[in-house]
A protein has these predicted regions:
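Vicinal oxygen chelate
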Residues: 1-8, 30-117, 128-135
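Short phosphate-engaging motifs
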Residues: 18-19, 85
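Major-groove DNA-recognition helix of helix-turn-helix-type DNA-binding domains
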Residues: 27
Length: 135
């Protein structure tokens, strides 16, 4: 039986340096062992890892075509402990260059969330869920 855990999420990016600047310098995520010239960047998250890898190389590694546009059918989420924390994280992302997709607001399921897109268009939800502690 497979253990229910996601250990690494790798985002295919069009410009590694731009994405590194967004995640490391803008959002403040610590890049693990990154050296100039590396083709991949890893960020240690609490309980998992986030990787950035050139989109064409990631597609080649997975033996699929790199073309494609629009919604990919997946979003990433960062959950916080309060509405105020959602607003603070969202503001940090926007100041780092994120594109606002949906401003944080009260949502139908009783929580509070908003969406932004990173420089490559990957959608991130920043949310507070009063019913489940996902922090």
């Amino acid at each position: 039986m497979m253990k229910a855990k996601i250990s690494l999420i790798t985002l295919g990016v069009s410009d590694l340096h731009r994405s590194l600047k967004f995640y490391r310098d803008g959002l403040g995520l610590p890049a693990h062992g990154y050296k100039e010239g590396n083709e991949v960047v890893f960020f240690e998250m609490e309980g998992s890892w986030l990787g950035l890898y050139p989109k064409d190389k990631l597609a080649e590694d997975a033996t699929v075509l790199p073309e494609g546009a629009g919604f990919a059918g997946i979003t990433l989420a960062h959950n916080t402990g309060s509405k105020e924390a959602v607003d603070a994280v969202f503001a940090l992302a926007v100041s780092a260059g994120a594109r606002v997709v949906k401003k944080p607001q009260d949502v139908f399921w009783g929580g509070y969330s908003g969406y932004f897109a990173d420089p490559d268009g990957h959608l991130w939800e920043v949310a507070w869920n009063p019913f489940m502690d996902l922090t």
